[in-house]
From Swiss-Prot:
Residues 1-32 form the signal peptide. One of its GO terms (molecular function) is type 1 orexin receptor binding. Neuropeptides that play a significant role in the regulation of food intake and sleep-wakefulness, possibly by coordinating the complex behavioral and physiologic responses of these complementary homeostatic functions. A broader role in the homeostatic regulation of energy metabolism, autonomic function, hormonal balance and the regulation of body fluids, is also suggested. Its main location: endoplasmic reticulum. InterPro entries: Orexin. The keyword Disulfide bond applies. GO terms for biological process: eating behavior; neuropeptide signaling pathway; positive regulation of cold-induced thermogenesis; positive regulation of transmission of nerve impulse; regulation of neurotransmitter secretion; response to starvation; sleep; temperature homeostasis. It is found in: Rough endoplasmic reticulum; Cytoplasmic vesicle; Synapse. Disulfide bonds join C38-C44, C39-C46. The modification Pyrrolidone carboxylic acid is found at Q33. One of its GO terms (cellular component) is synapse. This is Hypocretin neuropeptide precursor. Keywords: Amidation, Cleavage on pair of basic residues, Cytoplasmic vesicle, Disulfide bond, Endoplasmic reticulum, Neuropeptide, Pyrrolidone carboxylic acid, Signal, Synapse.
Length: 130
Protein backbone atom coordinates (compact mmCIF):
# COMPACT_ATOMS: atom_id res chain seq x y z
CA UNK A 1 0.00 0.00 0.00
CA UNK A 2 1.17 3.48 -0.82
CA UNK A 3 0.82 6.20 1.82
CA UNK A 4 -1.46 9.09 0.85
CA UNK A 5 0.24 11.90 -1.03
CA UNK A 6 0.92 15.03 0.99
CA UNK A 7 1.64 17.51 -1.79
CA UNK A 8 1.27 21.11 -0.73
CA UNK A 9 -0.18 23.42 -3.39
CA UNK A 10 2.30 25.95 -4.77
CA UNK A 11 -0.13 28.79 -4.10
CA UNK A 12 -0.30 27.89 -0.40
CA UNK A 13 3.49 27.93 -0.08
CA UNK A 14 3.69 31.27 -1.90
CA UNK A 15 1.00 32.78 0.32
CA UNK A 16 2.78 31.53 3.43
CA UNK A 17 6.07 33.08 2.28
CA UNK A 18 4.37 36.39 1.45
CA UNK A 19 2.82 36.52 4.90
CA UNK A 20 5.89 35.50 6.91
CA UNK A 21 8.84 36.93 4.99
CA UNK A 22 8.11 40.72 5.15
CA UNK A 23 7.62 40.84 8.95
CA UNK A 24 10.79 38.79 9.42
CA UNK A 25 12.79 41.12 7.19
CA UNK A 26 11.37 44.29 8.73
CA UNK A 27 11.67 43.21 12.37
CA UNK A 28 14.06 45.22 14.57
CA UNK A 29 16.07 42.07 15.31
CA UNK A 30 16.77 41.50 11.62
CA UNK A 31 17.87 45.09 11.11
CA UNK A 32 20.22 44.98 14.11
CA UNK A 33 22.13 41.93 12.87
CA UNK A 34 25.80 42.50 12.10
CA UNK A 35 26.93 42.54 8.50
CA UNK A 36 27.78 39.00 7.28
CA UNK A 37 31.37 38.20 6.28
CA UNK A 38 30.37 37.79 2.63
CA UNK A 39 29.24 41.43 2.55
CA UNK A 40 32.44 42.67 4.13
CA UNK A 41 34.40 40.83 1.44
CA UNK A 42 32.02 42.08 -1.32
CA UNK A 43 31.35 38.64 -2.79
CA UNK A 44 28.58 38.05 -5.32
CA UNK A 45 26.40 36.10 -2.88
CA UNK A 46 25.78 39.29 -0.94
CA UNK A 47 23.99 41.31 -3.65
CA UNK A 48 20.50 40.58 -2.34
CA UNK A 49 21.51 41.33 1.26
CA UNK A 50 22.88 44.72 0.15
CA UNK A 51 19.68 45.48 -1.76
CA UNK A 52 17.50 44.66 1.25
CA UNK A 53 19.55 46.40 3.94
CA UNK A 54 21.03 49.34 2.02
CA UNK A 55 19.69 52.89 2.10
CA UNK A 56 17.05 54.12 -0.35
CA UNK A 57 14.21 52.59 -2.37
CA UNK A 58 15.37 49.34 -3.94
CA UNK A 59 12.13 47.85 -5.23
CA UNK A 60 13.15 48.05 -8.88
CA UNK A 61 16.56 46.56 -8.15
CA UNK A 62 15.09 43.63 -6.26
CA UNK A 63 12.45 42.91 -8.91
CA UNK A 64 15.00 42.87 -11.73
CA UNK A 65 17.85 41.14 -9.85
CA UNK A 66 17.25 37.73 -11.42
CA UNK A 67 16.71 39.13 -14.92
CA UNK A 68 19.93 41.14 -15.13
CA UNK A 69 22.92 39.73 -16.95
CA UNK A 70 26.41 40.69 -15.91
CA UNK A 71 27.28 43.73 -17.95
CA UNK A 72 30.41 45.73 -18.49
CA UNK A 73 32.05 47.04 -15.29
CA UNK A 74 30.97 50.61 -16.05
CA UNK A 75 27.31 49.63 -16.12
CA UNK A 76 27.68 47.69 -12.85
CA UNK A 77 29.37 50.68 -11.20
CA UNK A 78 26.60 53.03 -12.32
CA UNK A 79 24.00 50.64 -10.93
CA UNK A 80 25.82 50.50 -7.59
CA UNK A 81 25.95 54.31 -7.44
CA UNK A 82 22.21 54.50 -8.16
CA UNK A 83 21.39 51.98 -5.45
CA UNK A 84 23.66 53.46 -2.78
CA UNK A 85 22.60 57.10 -3.24
CA UNK A 86 19.63 58.48 -1.32
CA UNK A 87 16.24 59.08 -2.93
CA UNK A 88 14.00 57.27 -5.39
CA UNK A 89 16.04 55.40 -7.97
CA UNK A 90 13.33 53.67 -10.00
CA UNK A 91 13.53 56.00 -13.01
CA UNK A 92 17.31 55.86 -13.16
CA UNK A 93 17.42 52.08 -12.89
CA UNK A 94 14.66 51.49 -15.43
CA UNK A 95 16.24 53.74 -18.07
CA UNK A 96 19.82 52.67 -17.41
CA UNK A 97 19.81 49.92 -20.03
CA UNK A 98 18.57 52.30 -22.71
CA UNK A 99 21.22 54.89 -21.89
CA UNK A 100 24.03 52.32 -21.97
CA UNK A 101 23.63 51.79 -25.74
CA UNK A 102 24.80 54.06 -28.53
CA UNK A 103 23.10 57.34 -29.32
CA UNK A 104 19.88 56.80 -31.28
CA UNK A 105 19.99 57.56 -34.98
CA UNK A 106 18.50 60.95 -35.90
CA UNK A 107 14.89 60.71 -36.95
CA UNK A 108 14.16 61.78 -40.51
CA UNK A 109 12.11 64.92 -40.96
CA UNK A 110 8.64 64.57 -42.48
CA UNK A 111 8.21 66.11 -45.90
CA UNK A 112 10.94 67.81 -47.94
CA UNK A 113 12.71 69.72 -45.19
CA UNK A 114 12.88 69.88 -41.42
CA UNK A 115 10.69 72.46 -39.66
CA UNK A 116 12.58 75.31 -38.04
CA UNK A 117 12.28 75.40 -34.26
CA UNK A 118 11.49 78.91 -33.05
CA UNK A 119 13.50 80.01 -30.03
CA UNK A 120 11.62 82.58 -27.92
CA UNK A 121 13.67 85.72 -27.48
CA UNK A 122 13.52 87.96 -24.46
CA UNK A 123 12.17 91.46 -25.03
CA UNK A 124 13.81 94.48 -23.37
CA UNK A 125 12.81 94.77 -19.74
CA UNK A 126 13.07 91.03 -19.06
CA UNK A 127 9.67 90.17 -20.52
CA UNK A 128 9.20 87.58 -23.20
CA UNK A 129 7.75 88.59 -26.54
CA UNK A 130 4.91 86.09 -26.28
Amino acid sequence: MNPPSTKVPWAAVTLLLLLLLPPALLSPGAAAQPLPDCCRQKTCSCRLYELLHGAGNHAAGILTLGKRRPGPPGLQGRLQRLLQASGNHAAGILTMGRRAGAEPAPRPCPGRRCPVVAVPSAAPGGRSGV
